[in-house]
């Protein structure tokens, strides 16, 4: 009969090599994934920093009736940078999402996949939080610009309600603000100049909000759909922690009871052995 030991050993070694190769490839893939996670996190942090800088620029512009062009240009650069970075983040998160969906479609389930899903959900939520803050900052600035326009109109003797002013802003026609204003004083001219400046700022803001609207809604819907999954994960983790704590407590109790039982057993043995020794000694003495 032919000895196939060497052949089987070679086949086993080949299988082991394949397993090692798969493990190495998987580890390399996860390393690259975590590098991507750090890159995305860095982009989100950059957006957050830019949003804070945007707030400072808003305050500087509102503090001056006629802000300098340099400050306005810096604000536009910040807004453009936020838009570019946000699009990068969205693209990378979409890529991760598609990769996860592809694996789920093949009914694959692993610890690595769960890690990637959790990281993706965390980054998506953080991204939406930052962009929500940016959106709130823009909306707040729009309201403050609108308030300044309303005050300047009052200076010229023209009173408007909030609804009327909103209609004027939505018309997109700056000439509508000059309607009915008597331009016979420097105060009226200065007021109209500031009105035009604030109106221009509002138009830029609305364009920026419009450009980011679709992306923001897309990411917000994604996070909302993930919310239930995240809540489930958190629920399971909390219950797992409770279970572990109970298990530790039960183990300590078991050890305590076991220790007491062991002491009782030793005491019983001692109680049995000592009389035995006494009896043996007595009997030995009698026979002696």
Curated annotation (Swiss-Prot):
Membrane topology: Single-pass type IV membrane protein
Places the protein is found: Cytoplasmic vesicle, Secretory vesicle, Synaptic vesicle membrane; Cell membrane; Synapse, Synaptosome
Transmembrane segments: 266-286
PTM section of the record: Phosphorylated by CK2. Phosphorylation at Ser-188 by DAPK1 significantly decreases its interaction with STXBP1.
Annotated S-S bridges: none
Cross-link (Glycyl lysine isopeptide (Lys-Gly) (interchain with G-Cter in SUMO)): 252-253, 256
Protein name: Syntaxin-1A
Subunit structure: Part of the SNARE core complex containing SNAP25, VAMP2 and STX1A; this complex constitutes the basic catalytic machinery of the complex neurotransmitter release apparatus. The SNARE complex interacts with CPLX1. Interacts with STXBP1. The interaction with STXBP1 promotes assembly of the SNARE complex. Interacts (via C-terminus) with KCNB1 (via C-terminus); the interaction increases in a calcium-dependent manner and induces a pore-independent enhancement of exocytosis in neuroendocrine cells, chromaffin cells, pancreatic beta cells and from the soma of dorsal root ganglia (DRG) neurons.
């Amino acid at each position: 009969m032919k000895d196939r030991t060497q052949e089987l050993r070679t086949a086993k070694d080949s299988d082991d090599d394949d397993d090692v190769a798969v493990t190495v490839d998987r580890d390399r893939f996860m390393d690259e994934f975590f590098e991507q996670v750090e890159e995305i996190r860095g982009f989100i942090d950059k957006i957050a920093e830019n949003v804070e800088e945007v707030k400072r620029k808003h305050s500087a512009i509102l503090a001056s009736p006629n802000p300098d062009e340099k400050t306005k240009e810096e604000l536009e650069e910040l807004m453009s940078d936020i838009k570019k970075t946000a699009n990068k983040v969205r693209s990378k998160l979409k890529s991760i999402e598609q990769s996860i969906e592809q694996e789920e479609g093949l009914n694959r389930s692993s610890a690595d996949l769960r890690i990637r899903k959790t990281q993706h959900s965390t980054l998506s939520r953080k991204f939406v939080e930052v962009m929500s803050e940016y959106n709130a900052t823009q909306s707040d600035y729009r309201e403050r610009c609108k308030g300044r326009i309303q005050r300047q109109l009052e200076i010229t003797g023209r009173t408007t309600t909030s609804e009327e002013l909103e209609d004027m802003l939505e018309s997109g026609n700056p000439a509508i603000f000059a309607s009915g204003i008597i331009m016979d004083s420097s105060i009226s001219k200065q007021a109209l100049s500031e009105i035009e400046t604030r109106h221009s700022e509002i138009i830029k803001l609305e364009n920026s909000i419009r450009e980011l609207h679709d992306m923001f809604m897309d990411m917000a819907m994604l996070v909302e759909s993930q919310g239930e999954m995240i809540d489930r994960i958190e629920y399971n983790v909390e219950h797992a922690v409770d279970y572990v704590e109970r298990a530790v407590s039960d183990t300590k109790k078991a050890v305590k009871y076991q220790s007491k039982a062991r002491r009782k057993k030793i005491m019983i043995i001692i109680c049995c052995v000592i009389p035995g020794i006494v009896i043996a000694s007595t009997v030995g003495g009698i026979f002696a």
